[in-house]
């Protein structure tokens, strides 16, 4: 999951106010930071984040544990807030056109390999996250795990109308066309 990291300690939406945060070049991601009271900044490549933080161009960025650690950003922005605002799914795709040209036994082999690959990738990613988190914690960075109330506050910022979005919520601006998908995901989450 991706979380925010900054040069200032924070544990609430109010603590995001005024922070310049490097974001992916994606309007929804920028707006997400803006509704939290920060300013989403684009145009800074992943390899430039460390120096942009050191120079004061930005106050932080957002990413996962391995990237935060591997890029050395944890040395420049020592406060990591575990808000886990996005999760990027890892997807395996196969062309229906190609699969239709294979015999059934080969298609089954490919499907089985995909299942095994999924389990292997999850294991390796979990190991990398654990290793990166350990390095960051041992370096003395401050890791903030949100309270249930603070987590709910971050979620509410996404669903409540925002001046930053002309009175719309982030969900209204970006989720309307995908409401059936959002509802299906929420239903799965409720089952756990």
Language model regions located:
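N-terminal secretory/targeting leader peptides
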Residues: 1-192
């Amino acid at each position: 999951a991706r979380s925010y990291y900054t040069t200032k300690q924070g544990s609430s939406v109010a603590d995001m106010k005024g922070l310049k945060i490097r974001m992916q070049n994606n309007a929804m991601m920028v707006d997400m930071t803006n509704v939290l009271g920060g300013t989403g900044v684009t145009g800074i490549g992943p390899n430039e984040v460390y120096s942009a933080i050191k120079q004061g161009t930005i106050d932080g960025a957002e990413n996962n544990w391995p990237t935060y650690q591997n890029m050395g950003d944890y040395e420049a922005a020592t406060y990591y807030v575990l808000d886990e605002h996005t999760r990027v799914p890892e997807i395996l795709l196969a062309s229906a056109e190609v699969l239709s040209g294979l015999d059934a036994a080969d298609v089954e082999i490919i499907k089985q390999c995909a299942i095994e690959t999924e389990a292997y990738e999850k294991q390796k990613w979990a190991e990398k996250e654990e290793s990166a988190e350990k390095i960051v914690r041992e370096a003395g960075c401050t890791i903030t795990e949100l309270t249930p109330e603070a987590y709910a506050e971050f979620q509410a910022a996404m669903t409540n109308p925002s001046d930053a979005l002309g009175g719309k919520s982030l969900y209204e601006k970006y989720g309307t066309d995908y409401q059936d998908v959002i509802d299906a995901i929420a239903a799965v989450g409720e089952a756990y």
